[in-house]
Amino acid sequence: MPSNPSLLSSPKQRHGGGYEKIAADFLQQQGLVVLAKNWQQPNVGEIDLILLHPEEVWNTLVFAEVRKRKVSNYGDALMSITRAKQCKLIKTARFFLRHHPNYAHLECRFDVVAFNEQVGASKAHKFIQPEWVQGAFMANAW
């Protein structure tokens, strides 16, 4: 998917693309390196951000989902990632590793960067700090 927000196909995608950029910038400030944005496997799924997390002992490949949601009775951004969505992300990550075997030896982790907006927040208070959840869910039997 193009990195230029004006090329995204819907207002929802353009809005989400803005949060993905904020998330990517935030994670880079934490020392992660962005490898890919909006990586897609046709008919399987898309991963918002794929990053390398350099650590002292080994590097970790991070597949990150970015979610923004208004807090409501239906839960926050983190809770919006259903088991079905997790399975789709895991399946897409497997395709990424098949297409990029040079990363296959790395430890892998699924993170979420969540943005929760309070319902009724004024525009002046609309900016939301990202909540970074490392290892938000696990893949069984890679």
Please place each PLM-identified region on the residue numbering.
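Acidic-basic catalytic patches of nuclease active cores, encompassing PD-(D/E)XK
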Residues: 1-38
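Conserved catalytic cores of phosphodiester-cleaving nucleases, focusing on short active-site segments
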Residues: 27, 47-53, 57-71, 89
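Short acidic/glycine-enriched loop/turn segments that link adjacent beta-strands
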Residues: 42-45
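Mg2+/Mn2+-dependent nuclease catalytic core
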Residues: 69-93
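Metal-dependent nuclease catalytic cores in nucleic-acid-processing enzymes
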Residues: 90-102
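Domain-level recognition of nuclease-like catalytic cores that cleave nucleotide substrates
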Residues: 100-142
